[in-house]
A protein has these predicted regions:
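Membrane-interfacial amphipathic/re-entrant helices at transmembrane-helix boundaries
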Residues: 1-21
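Helix-loop-helix "hairpin" substructures at the membrane interface of multi-pass membrane proteins
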Residues: 131-202
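Hydrophobic alpha-helical transmembrane segments
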Residues: 13-18, 61-66, 91-92, 131-136, ...
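Transmembrane helix-bundle core of multi-pass membrane transporters
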Residues: 6-11, 82, 90-150
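Cytosolic-side transmembrane-helix boundaries in multi-pass membrane proteins
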Residues: 241-248, 252-263
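Short loop segments and helix-boundary regions at transmembrane helix junctions
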Residues: 28-111, 207-219, 238-239, 262
Length: 263
């Protein structure tokens, strides 16, 4: 394959693998705990951090990470209050992040920034720094889930039972929300804000067609996610279409085929 000779494509392949590992692990918790809507809110809230980074002249990804983690904590805290419904808390941070992102990006000095890279992503432009961030996150998630897999499963499936077992549920919930936020930000370069949530849900939905085991869903999700990324890259190359959209298209196609097979 001639493509494999290019550094940018090698980076894209490695980024796909690392992102598939990170998304496969934390995405299984998201789908099991039914946090898809919350994750979507955090994804769009990260746009506020991107705008702030562009305005302040710092790394947009770094500021997006901080903003996303704080938004995740805010959603978690507000959703536990009796005077605030969870969907309302999500809507607050979702719209606040988007509004701040637009405002700060237009107030940024110099030429108007190109926001399409953050909204829609391009896996072919990921850098060594992005790979290091993804690799570090994947390693941390592997270690964390290996050490605390049973408490995480208890929290994911039955919060009340986890509390009765003396598990510090609130601590795990906040830590996992932080990992969700960091994983979302790490994938922005690949598929962008608009499509990032798909990497955290579609492979898990596909895996769930074949097994209900939490651990097996993780393993299958990683493989399915990587397959979707590979397919998306080649579709993008041959059809000359955006890589982020191609990855999601192939992932949904895989889900549809598996759904038909399992009928």
């Amino acid at each position: 394959m001639d493509l494999l000779q290019y550094t940018f494509f090698q980076h894209a392949l490695l980024g796909s693998l690392l992102a598939s590992i990170a998304c496969g692990i934390i995405g299984t918790y998201i789908v099991t705990r039914r946090l898809v809507f919350i994750s979507g809110g955090i994804t769009h809230a990260s746009f506020g951090g991107i705008g702030l980074g562009l305005f302040a002249g710092i790394s947009p990804i770094l500021s997006a990470a901080v903003f996303s983690v704080l938004s995740a904590f805010g959603v978690e805290w507000l959703s536990k209050r009796k005077d605030m419904r969870e969907d309302s808390a999500i809507a607050v941070f979702w719209t606040l992040g988007m509004a701040l992102g637009i405002m700060f990006s237009f107030l940024s000095p110099g030429f108007a920034p190109d926001l399409s890279a953050y909204l829609f992503g391009n896996i072919l432009t990921i850098t060594r720094g992005d790979l290091l961030m993804l690799g570090l996150l994947a390693i941390i998630l592997i270690i964390f889930f290996c050490l605390f897999i049973h408490p995480i499963i208890y929290v994911a499936f039955d919060r009340e039972f986890a509390c009765s077992q003396g598990i510090p549920v609130a601590v795990f919930e906040y830590l996992l929300m932080m990992f969700i936020a960091l994983t979302i930000v790490s994938c922005l370069r690949m598929v962008g804000i608009v499509l990032a949530i798909s990497l955290l849900t579609i492979p898990q939905m596909t895996a769930n067609l074949f097994t209900y085991s939490f651990k097996r869903i993780i393993w299958l999700s990683i493989g399915i996610g990587f397959l979707g990324c590979l397919g998306g890259l080649f579709v993008s190359y041959h059809w000359k279409v955006p890589s982020g959209a191609s990855i999601i298209f192939v992932s949904i196609l895989i889900y549809a085929v598996c759904k038909v097979i399992k009928r």
